[in-house]
């Protein structure tokens, strides 16, 4: 089980986590902040909107389930590519080994 968590703030982050192989995605920081500031109803609204937006992302990318996002080609920025390469990892191997 691969859990995508930490720094997940919006639908784009959720989609990226699934595309990189996450089985589930944790979004606790924003939920706790919303509960503290606006109550449980705000959290429910946030997750309802996030779910709608994720469905739109999946529609645009031809995915019928979040796990299908693993099949979508991932394009890394120059900064990310350099970060990975400078740590001795093979980006091609990492990209082809996505679940």
Describe the residue ranges of each PLM region.
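Short beta-strand/loop segments at the ligand-binding rim of alpha/beta enzyme cores
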Residues: 1-5
């Amino acid at each position: 089980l691969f859990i995508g968590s930490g720094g997940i703030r919006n639908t784009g982050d959720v989609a990226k986590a699934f595309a990189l192989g996450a089985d589930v995605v944790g979004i606790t920081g924003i939920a706790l902040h919303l509960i503290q500031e606006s109550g449980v109803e705000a959290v429910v609204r946030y997750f309802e909107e996030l779910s709608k937006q994720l469905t739109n992302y999946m529609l645009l990318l031809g995915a019928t389930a979040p796990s299908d996002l693993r099949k979508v080609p991932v394009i890394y920025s120059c900064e990310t590519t350099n970060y990975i390469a400078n740590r001795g990892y093979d980006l091609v191997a990492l990209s082809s080994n996505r679940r």
